[in-house]
Design a protein with these regions (language model features):
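Cleavable N-terminal export/targeting peptides
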Residues: 1-32
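Gram-negative (and chloroplast) outer-membrane scaffold detector with strong preference
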Residues: 23-24, 37-44, 66-152, 160-166, ...
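Transmembrane beta-barrel domains of Gram-negative outer membranes and organellar outer membranes
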Residues: 26, 32-47, 51-53
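Short, solvent-exposed loop/turn segments at secondary-structure boundaries
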Residues: 50-55, 90-94
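Short catalytic helix/loop segments, enriched in acidic residues and glycine
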Residues: 57-64
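Solvent-exposed loop segments that connect transmembrane elements
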Residues: 135-142, 180-192
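Internal, hydrophobic beta-strand segments that form the core of beta-sheet-rich folds
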Residues: 172-173
């Protein structure tokens, strides 16, 4: 009887150790298919214009939000908005621009066995815009200036899961397209043929899987 009890005890320890080992080797699994994101952003300076001139902005900080849904355990579809304040120092322009991204896209993750890290790559399409208010000190009037256009881009980053429902998220996003839609006080202006404008954003925030 004593030998039988020892054999059962040894078998239970072996099974528990094997189950714990298998569990530790499993990749992290979010607690929900839905995900809500909030993040801070840092956008590098960019240039908007054509062969005859351009408007150059400086690097700036901002914030954004996203909402997404896991179509599969690895594929996320999402939509979001991101706004960054960028300085400018051009003749006739002295102040700040608001750089806005409104985008929809998808991200593919690459689970790592036994790790809380979850790397991903993605792609997006959307609309970007630069907006500001131009003050004419000679006349004392102000005008709203906006430059916008469609864009496409790629992104990459990594999540670190603090728990199945909360992950720290950091990444980079690159967008390319023309901002040829120019408006002053809502009236469209002729910009000619604009060059491609590249925007680069670094982001750091958190994902919540409710």
């Amino acid at each position: 009887m004593q030998r039988l009890l020892l054999a059962v005890f040894d078998a239970s320890i072996t099974f528990a150790g094997s189950a714990q080992s298998q569990q530790s080797q499993r990749p992290v699994t979010p607690s929900s298919r839905w995900v809500l994101n909030g993040h801070s952003s840092a956008a590098l300076g960019t240039s908007v214009g054509d062969a005859f001139g351009s408007i150059d902005t400086h690097s700036g900080l901002g914030a954004g939000i996203e909402a997404g849904y896991l179509i599969t355990p690895r594929l996320l579809a999402y939509a979001g908005v991101d706004i960054v304040k960028q300085g400018v120092n051009e003749v006739g322009l002295d102040g700040d621009f608001g750089l806005t991204h409104i985008e929809a896209g998808a991200r593919l993750s690459f689970p790592i066995s036994g790790s809380k890290l979850l790397p991903y790559v993605g792609g997006w399409v959307g609309r970007r815009g630069l907006t500001t208010t131009v003050d004419d000190f000679a006349t004392g009037t102000s005008s709203d200036l906006s430059l916008s256009g469609l864009a496409a881009g790629a992104s990459g980053g990594v999540q670190f899961f603090v728990s199945p429902s909360l992950a720290i998220d950091g990444g980079v996003s690159l967008g390319v397209g023309k901002m040829g839609n120019v408006k002053v006080d809502g009236q469209k202006e002729d910009w000619g043929t604009p060059d491609n404008t590249t925007t680069t954003r670094l982001r750091f925030g958190a994902n919540w899987y409710p």
